[in-house]
C-alpha cells in the first residue's frame, strides 16, 4: 500500500478548478456585454421635469424651477454624468457644435451637473457652450436613477467609446461620482412636452446629433 499522494488526480482537480474559474469569468464577460441586466430607464414626464429645483453656480446662487429653462423657447439640456469624464467632455463638445443651428432656431443649450467639486465645472465649460446649473437632488438623472458599476468596464462598447474619445484628443480625471448615468433632453416651449429623451445605457453612449436637431426644429416658441 502506497501512502504517497496521487499527483495525477491532484493535477486533474486543479485543472478542473482552473477551467471552472475561466468558464465563470468568460460567462461573466459575455453577460456584461448583453443588455439583459441593464436597468431600464423610466421615461420622464413633463410634470416631473417642471418641478425639478435647480441652482445657479454664480457667486450668489439662486434656486429656481427647471421649467424656467424652456418656458419661452424650449431647450436642449444635457444631464452630465461627471464633468471630469473625458467621454462627457466629448459629448458636450459635440452638442456645442450644434450651437449655431440652435441659435438660429432660438433654442438655448444648457447642462446640469449633480455636484460641484473644485474647478470641475469651470474646466468642463471649456467643452460646453451653454449655461450650467446644479441639480443637487439628481432629478434630471431620474425619475429612477440608474447606475453602471464596475461591470461597465467589461463591456466592449465602453472600451470602444474610450478609444474613440482618446483618439479624438479628449482627456479627463477621476474626480466626482461617475456611476450615475446621464442623458440629453430636448424639451418644447411651454407645455409642448418632451420631444427627445436620450438616456445613457453605458459609459459614453452619446445622443444622436441629427436627432437633437430634428427635435429642436419641432419646438414652437411661445408668444411673449
Swiss-Prot record:
Keywords assigned: Antioxidant, Cytoplasm, Redox-active center, Selenocysteine
Main location per the UniProt record: cytoplasm
Region (Thioredoxin fold): 14-112
Domain of life: Eukaryota
Any GO CC annotation of this UniProt entry: cytoplasm
GO molecular function ontology, one term from the record: antioxidant activity
Keyword hit for Zinc-finger: no
Compartment annotation: Cytoplasm
Signal keyword on record: no
Gene3D superfamilies xref list: Glutaredoxin
InterPro entries: PXL2A/B/C (IPR032801), Thioredoxin-like_sf (IPR036249)
Pfam family, one: AhpC-TSA_2
Catalytic site positions: 88 (redox-active)
Function: Involved in redox regulation of the cell. Acts as an antioxidant. Inhibits TNFSF11-induced NFKB1 and JUN activation and osteoclast differentiation. May affect bone resorption and help to maintain bone mass.
Family: Belongs to the peroxiredoxin-like PRXL2 family. PRXL2A subfamily.
PANTHER family in UniProt: PEROXIREDOXIN-LIKE 2A, PTHR28630
Note: The active site Cys-88 corresponds to one of the redox-active cysteines of peroxiredoxins.
Name of the protein: Peroxiredoxin-like 2A
Amino acid at each position: 500500500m502506497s501512502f504517497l499522494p496521487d499527483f495525477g488526480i491532484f493535477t486533474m482537480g486543479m485543472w478542473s478548478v482552473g477551467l471552472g474559474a475561466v468558464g465563470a469569468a468568460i460567462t461573466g464577460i459575455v453577460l456584461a456585454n448583453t443588455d439583459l441586466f441593464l436597468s431600464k430607464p423610466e421615461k420622464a414626464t413633463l410634470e416631473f421635469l417642471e418641478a425639478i429645483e435647480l441652482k445657479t453656480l454664480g457667486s450668489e446662487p439662486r434656486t429656481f424651477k427647471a421649467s424656467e429653462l424652456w418656458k419661452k423657447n424650449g431647450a436642449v439640456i444635457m444631464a452630465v454624468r461627471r464633468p471630469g469624464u473625458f467621454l462627457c467632455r466629448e459629448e458636450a463638445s459635440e452638442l456645442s457644435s450644434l450651437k449655431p443651428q440652435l441659435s438660429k432656431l432660438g433654442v438655448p443649450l444648457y447642462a446640469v451637473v449633480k455636484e460641484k467639486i473644485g474647478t470641475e465645472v469651470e474646466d468642463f465649460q471649456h467643452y460646453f457652450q451653454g449655461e450650467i446649473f446644479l441639480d443637487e437632488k439628481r432629478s434630471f438623472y431620474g425619475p429612477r436613477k440608474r447606475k453602471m458599476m464596475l461591470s461597465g468596464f467589461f463591456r466592449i462598447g465602453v472600451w470602444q467609446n474610450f478609444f474613440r474619445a482618446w483618439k479624438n484628443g479628449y482627456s479627463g480625471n477621476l474626480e466626482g461620482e461617475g456611476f450615475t448615468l446621464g442623458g440629453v433632453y430636448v424639451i418644447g416651449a411651454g407645455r409642448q412636452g418632451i420631444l427627445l429623451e436620450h438616456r445613457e445605457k453605458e459609459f459614453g453612449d452619446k445622443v444622436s446629433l441629427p436627432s437633437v436637431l430634428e427635435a429642436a426644429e419641432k419646438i414652437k416658441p411661445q408668444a411673449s
